């Protein structure tokens, strides 16, 4: 996400390195973690090259329980006295809205609003940046979070499959949730292989579409 001169990465999955090359990502000012499940954080070590030319540590923002888990999972990064060459990352517990400052131009910053959500029995976070919000791996959105999602240009929302799953929204529930939020455009993500892209697309109304690798869009700050 590029916003107000700040470059943000939401989660770092197993193919982050390949996707970063593909997208031409040259700098990262912060990593926003939705939750600590392996498929969303295993690429964290691949932030290393972004610290070669600028040794300013990259902040990692996560819900407190996920931050604690990540400190254990990546202890070689976050413990005191790490050896030279490990990614210089700083963990920050997310307890409310916060600002991310550009590592290259400290006078530039952007406000981040965390969106509490639920992934099965796990408390997780979505993130709102201006009129864009990202909510993946969601089974429930608490009522209190809906007020944080008003007036969106673009929403990216979890939609796994048609069959129920204890930790993800079904397509039907995701569509209902998107209609309730009322973003101008909703893109569904984290789809399984049980539905083809074109078939999914044909089922959706105006202002809704399945996401895909390489998708780009704009939203107001």
Language-model segments: what does each one mean?
Residues 1-135, 201-221:
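Binuclear metal-dependent hydrolase catalytic cores
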Residues 140-221:
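Cap/insert and terminal regions of metallo-dependent hydrolase folds
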């Amino acid at each position: 996400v590029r916003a107000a001169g700040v470059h943000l990465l939401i989660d770092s999955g197993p193919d982050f390195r390949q996707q970063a090359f593909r997208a031409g990502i040259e700098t990262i000012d912060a990593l926003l973690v939705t939750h600590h499940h392996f498929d969303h954080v295993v690429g964290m070590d691949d932030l290393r090259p972004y610290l070669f030319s600028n040794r300013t540590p990259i902040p990692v923002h996560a819900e407190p329980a996920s931050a604690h888990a990540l400190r254990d999972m990546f202890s070689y990064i976050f413990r005191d006295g790490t050896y030279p060459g490990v990614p210089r990352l700083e963990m920050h517990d997310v307890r409310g809205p916060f600002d991310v400052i550009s590592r290259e131009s400290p006078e530039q910053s952007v406000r981040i609003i965390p969106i509490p959500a639920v992934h099965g029995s796990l408390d997780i976070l979505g993130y709102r940046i201006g009129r864009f919000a990202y909510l993946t791996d969601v089974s429930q959105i608490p009522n209190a979070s809906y007020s944080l999602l008003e007036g969106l240009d673009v929403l990216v929302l979890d939609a796994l499959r048609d069959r129920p799953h204890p930790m993800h929204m079904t397509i039907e529930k995701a569509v209902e949730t998107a209609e309730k939020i009322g973003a101008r455009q909703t893109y569904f993500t984290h789809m399984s292989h049980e539905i083809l892209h074109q078939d999914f697309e044909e089922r959706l109304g105006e202002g809704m579409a399945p996401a895909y690798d390489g998708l780009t869009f704009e939203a107001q700050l």
